Amino acid sequence: MFSHIMIGTNDLDRAKTFYDAALGALGVSPGVFNGNRVFYRTATGVFAVSKPINGEPASIGNGSTMGFAAATPALADAWHAAGLAAGGMACEDPPGVRNG
């Protein structure tokens, strides 16, 4: 169901130290820095820790993202359109492959 989950942090170095240890105990490789984010990739999805893109401090929900997996780009576009039609609001780029 999920392709990725991202949570916010105000201290990326401290978060990386914590998640390297915690996820390492599950056999996950150490996180990889990419700008203001740290990514933990596995065969089944991605967990990431990020400073919020809006520049505000991380708090409950700010800096957090969950990506729903879609079987095709057309389904991802349909999902996005349905969400907007139901009153949702786009907060970042439209659906598509994210580099990083």
Model regions: which residues?
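Extracytoplasmic/periplasmic beta-strand context in beta-sandwich domains
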Residues: 36-38, 51, 93
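Extreme N-terminal starter segment of soluble prokaryotic enzymes
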Residues: 1-3
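Intrinsically disordered, low-complexity segments enriched in polar/charged residues with Gly/Pro
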Residues: 25-27, 54-55, 95-97
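Vicinal oxygen chelate
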Residues: 10-14, 68-100
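Core segments of cupin and vicinal oxygen chelate
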Residues: 7-47
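Long, continuous compositionally biased terminal/linker segments
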Residues: 41-78, 84
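Short, contiguous strand/loop micro-motifs
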Residues: 5-7, 66-67
